[in-house]
Amino acid sequence: MANVSKKVSWSGRDRDDEEAAPLLRRTARPGGGTPLLNGAGPGAARQSPRSALFRVGHMSSVELDDELLDPDMDPPHPFPKEIPHNEKLLSLKYESLDYDNSENQLFLEEERRINHTAFRTVEIKRWVICALIGILTGLVACFIDIVVENLAGLKYRVIKGNIDKFTEKGGLSFSLLLWATLNAAFVLVGSVIVAFIEPVAAGSGIPQIKCFLNGVKIPHVVRLKTLVIKVSGVILSVVGGLAVGKEGPMIHSGSVIAAGISQGRSTSLKRDFKIFEYFRRDTEKRDFVSAGAAAGVSAAFGAPVGGVLFSLEEGASFWNQFLTWRIFFASMISTFTLNFVLSIYHGNMWDLSSPGLINFGRFDSEKMAYTIHEIPVFIAMGVVGGVLGAVFNALNYWLTMFRIRYIHRPCLQVIEAVLVAAVTATVAFVLIYSSRDCQPLQGGSMSYPLQLFCADGEYNSMAAAFFNTPEKSVVSLFHDPPGSYNPLTLGLFTLVYFFLACWTYGLTVSAGVFIPSLLIGAAWGRLFGISLSYLTGAAIWADPGKYALMGAAAQLGGIVRMTLSLTVIMMEATSNVTYGFPIMLVLMTAKIVGDVFIEGLYDMHIQLQSVPFLHWEAPVTSHSLTAREVMSTPVTCLRRREKVGVIVDVLSDTASNHNGFPVVEHADDTQPARLQGLILRSQLIVLLKHKVFVERSNLGLVQRRLRLKDFRDAYPRFPPIQSIHVSQDERECTMDLSEFMNPSPYTVPQEASLPRVFKLFRALGLRHLVVVDNRNQVVGLVTRKDLARYRLGKRGLEELSLAQT
């Protein structure tokens, strides 16, 4: 753990800087806890001799890691450490994004120079970017689908030929070894590239994108390298036979594509195409990432409307009508691109019948009709889905806690992934080998039928579920005719795949949980339908396919707790509006029942990572708290004209300041300093880099006036303060912040209630909210962590502890 008082060595320091140093150095209290209410008394502002650095009130300091000395630059991802992450902690390592434009003089001057034609051009560029997002997301989805189809097909053909060969000769243990080895080999490569190259590419990426859109800066989450590892990893995971799907990671992939395209450059490749420079800020990037997430859903399921609703329900924290149109446009372009390219690949250029990575097939409303009497049955299935989803999430919670504590090294993570791959193949082989459920072989009933000990013209039905990609297994459970599976086969498959999927989610591989959830639900849903037909004998229950559909919706809803978007996704993926109402009932019931026991899977993992995630509303019992009780103090304030040495020292000491600094000024020597504006750390970094000093301007040493473009060129990887050399003479210079600060920051009185502060902060996407008294003096600063630390628990309002990492 780094000491917060660690200083950066500079070329020189004068006596005034040494006098100011005690205010800049704060040592963390080992084991110091955070008080229940972070109250701040009316502390007087303190000023160091001959400097303009202010501290207001009191603060409990915390320890930070070395890599966080400059929060505005993404830290290099270290190997995971054994840290006490859980849902009762809030990590200090996460920083916020700036979703509120800083309306300083540079910004206003640029906006005033833009005429109506230029604004129309900017709007056209937004639509062009959305089209590019849709096209590239669709192409990435095509690449994943084609590679998975070919590699998985090759693997299953080799294993099938080997099993057919050794079934007659004996020695099926060699077939088991071959299957387990192939699976382990693919997963080994997929896990190594994630664990050692880009850990943020693990999982589906949906929790990370939710956090990004919420305003939390997740390092490396939208990097080009992350996209490459994500795509490669998900291919290897699916081909490796894990209980995963390739659809969930498409949401992350689409988001990365959107973040890259919208900036008109690649910082990873160090290529700047000099286009779309206007959009190089967090506010614009956020909107395009929302479109990318929707395009990913659209490409995965062929559901453009569902993609828009998913982005609204699970992703985008900020919304407007124009954004809705652009997101829908990107989603439509994405699914059309995928459809068109796959039609060419399959040799049917004008047959646009493959809108998504998974095609659930058409459900014939006439053959699969439902009546009003089945509504209670569907609701009961929703209850089952909610309970099973809660069990799934609870088991995965304890498994994740175990991994955080004991499997935190990359080598151990790779070993676990390979072990799961081998166990998955072994369990599948044993179940297929032990099953005597033989069914007549029908044309096209399955891609790789295994005969084993069945008679000629028959195949092992357990293999139809296990010996296939998960997407094809889902379609098989939906559409295979009645009698294709016996109850024992479905029961065993449900039980085994449930635990395999639970064990698999959270591995250090790129994979999603959508398809495994659908597959589990389709299996027990089909079993539910078969049991119902046995009990009643009525023809109305004859087709188990509709119960497989309802079970799939119930299981997925019980795990991820989405209602609106999942209803539309299922309707679009099945090309059937008839079942819209029962699907909605099932999903709502599953969510209500599941929420009684535990959070949804994505929200649970966000909490386990101790992310300061802000929900839509403040806790319902928080009206008794005020801004004065939740704000952070002391606040580091700067003057309009500030010494360079003071600014350098402030930026070097991240333990005692935030990433925004109120700018204050005295009316005269007898009056207290009043708030004049707010300036960000990133802006100060750029000013220091370009040496925008008053003395240099007076001597004519500044070649040109700083423009907004200079700040955009530095975005998003602002250089660390350690990389900027400031000489002893330059430390004595002065910096005028008037032109660069935001002169109208959002403020609240210290008596404002927590819900009101929360609503203002959350709705406007703020990073800092200044708390002032009735004389407009700064008394505190509200940040994301100050609001996220209050959460409604089972026993009322809870305050989370701050993690020392």
UniProtKB/Swiss-Prot annotation:
One function term, GO molecular function aspect: chloride channel activity
Impact after mutating R286W: In OPTA2; uncertain significance
Cited InterPro entries: CBS_dom (IPR000644), CBS_dom_sf (IPR046342), CIC-7 (IPR002249), Cl-channel/antiporter (IPR051280), Cl-channel_core (IPR014743), ClC (IPR001807)
Disulfide bonds: none
GO cellular component: chloride channel complex; intracellular membrane-bounded organelle; lysosomal membrane; membrane
Documented effect of changing R767W: In OPTA2 and OPTB4
Principal place of residence: membrane
Known outcome of mutating Y715C: In HOD; increased voltage-gated chloride channel activity; increased lysosomal lumen acidification; increased cytoplasmic vacuole size
Compartments it resides in: Lysosome membrane
Site (Mediates proton transfer from the protein to the inner aqueous phase): E314
Consequence the record notes for mutating L224R: In OPTB4; uncertain significance
Binding site for ATP: H658, N659, G660, T783, R784, K785, D786
Parts of the chain on the Cytoplasmic side: 1-126, 598-805
Topological relation to the membrane, as annotated: Multi-pass membrane protein
Domain spans labelled CBS: 631-695, 741-799
Catalytic activity: 2 chloride(in) + H(+)(out) = 2 chloride(out) + H(+)(in)
Tissue specificity comment: Brain and kidney.
GO biological process, alphabetically ordered: response to pH; transepithelial chloride transport
Entry similarity comment: Belongs to the chloride channel (TC 2.A.49) family. ClC-7/CLCN7 subfamily.
Disease named in the record: Osteopetrosis, autosomal recessive 4: A rare genetic disease characterized by abnormally dense bone, due to defective resorption of immature bone. Osteopetrosis occurs in two forms: a severe autosomal recessive form occurring in utero, infancy, or childhood, and a benign autosomal dominant form occurring in adolescence or adulthood. Recessive osteopetrosis commonly manifests in early infancy with macrocephaly, feeding difficulties, evolving blindness and deafness, bone marrow failure, severe anemia, and hepatosplenomegaly. Osteopetrosis, autosomal dominant 2: A rare genetic disease characterized by abnormally dense bone, due to defective resorption of immature bone. Osteopetrosis occurs in two forms: a severe autosomal recessive form occurring in utero, infancy, or childhood, and a benign autosomal dominant form occurring in adolescence or adulthood. OPTA2 is the most common form of osteopetrosis, occurring in adolescence or adulthood. It is characterized by sclerosis, predominantly involving the spine, the pelvis and the skull base.
Function: Slowly voltage-gated channel mediating the exchange of chloride ions against protons. Functions as antiporter and contributes to the acidification of the lysosome lumen and may be involved in maintaining lysosomal pH. The CLC channel family contains both chloride channels and proton-coupled anion transporters that exchange chloride or another anion for protons. The presence of conserved gating glutamate residues is typical for family members that function as antiporters.
Complexes and interactors: Chloride channel 7 are heteromers of alpha (CLCN7) and beta (OSTM1) subunits.
Name listed for the protein in its UniProt record: H(+)/Cl(-) exchange transporter 7
Organism, scientific name: Homo sapiens
Gene from which this protein is expressed: CLCN7
